[in-house]
Amino acid sequence: MKRNPHFVSLTKNYLFADLQKRVAQFRLENPQHTVINLSIGDTTQPLNASVAEAFASSIARLSSPTTCRGYGPDFGLPALRQKLSEDFYRGCVDAKEIFISDGAKADLFRLLSFFGPNQTVAIQDPSYPAYLDIARLTGAKEIIALPCLQENAFFPEFPEDTHIDILCLCSPNNPTGTVLNKDQLRAIVHYAIEHEILILFDAAYSTFISDPSLPKSIFEIPDARFCAIEINSFSKPLGFAGIRLGWTVIPQELTYADGHFVIQDWERFLSTTFNGASIPAQEAGVAGLSILPQLEAIHYYRENSDLLRKALLATGFEVFGGEHAPYLWVKPTQANISDRDLFDFFLREYHIAITPGIGFGRSGSGFVRFSSLGKREDILAACERLQMAPALQS
């Protein structure tokens, strides 16, 4: 049996797995210290009571011979698709265009597999490392990094002389924590239409947006229906990280170059490759959408971001993002300090684990990412430790 040649292009370990190994090793060698882990974007708040009740009720029905059921619909429960259309998208996306899945990362892999190998894929730099790995695993012909630099407010730089087939775009962004405004998103949509580019828009953090003028969906730009697919997730807002539930939107207007409708092929693709998301997860998702605008967990994580930002600024760092995303993109004031050295410094001196920016791409060099998804007591303890960071000041 021959090895899949695409594995050769991957690094030995996935970024976050490697970081957790380093943290575990530090804990093993330094049992006297308590490490606060702000390096991963994992949720810490429990399920809302009404969501947990819906989940439990669904499981109870599966345990009864009179109410149990087998496979659900391949494309998702009609009630969940309809509620997303009405409550989340306010009618700008039809229920038939929404396809329920087992999470955003799985859908990203399905989509890049669906469009096939030999595509030229453009990715924001820095970006969530799964984009790069999945593009490699699915046989991308070329992967183009779009620098998102501080001097451009982390807005991607687009080439004028390079053909792109697929653009992976994330807003609110992971890792920079920044969000595109409507004018910026409209400009990207028009660029994509002009250059015949498909946008895969990752909106997994859209529920963190508190400013009503900022777009939560790419389909707030009407022309995006001709060039974009949107991916979203219940993981962060509802605490479904371990439950696995997400969705993808395929507009009915979206076509290939030959005029064939993408949604028709997607339905055929899912019928072959996916038997539908967990029914209890979907029924819990319906309950979650009813309380999403008032969800306490989102406010909790925003408050965490505010606490971290104040502590980091007081320490002398430059801080970006965090207002509309659970991530803060942080630049040390000390010159000539590498990402790895900064990671080790925090772990060694303050027993705080963060994510080195270089792990998200070359343009992440000189930055680190803080996650605000931790427990409040850990955030407060981290803020207290950050007050003792004179060694990092210029």
UniProtKB/Swiss-Prot annotation:
Protein name from the UniProt record: LL-diaminopimelate aminotransferase
Domain of life from the UniProt record: Bacteria
Cofactor: pyridoxal 5'-phosphate
Enzyme class: transferase
Annotated source species: Chlamydia trachomatis serovar L2 (strain ATCC VR-902B / DSM 19102 / 434/Bu)
GO biological process, one term: lysine biosynthetic process via diaminopimelate, diaminopimelate-aminotransferase pathway
NCBIfam families linked to this entry: DAPAT_plant
Binding residues for substrate: Y14, G41, K105, Y128, N174, N275, R369
Pathways per UniProt: Amino-acid biosynthesis; L-lysine biosynthesis via DAP pathway; LL-2,6-diaminopimelate from (S)-tetrahydrodipicolinate (aminotransferase route): step 1/1
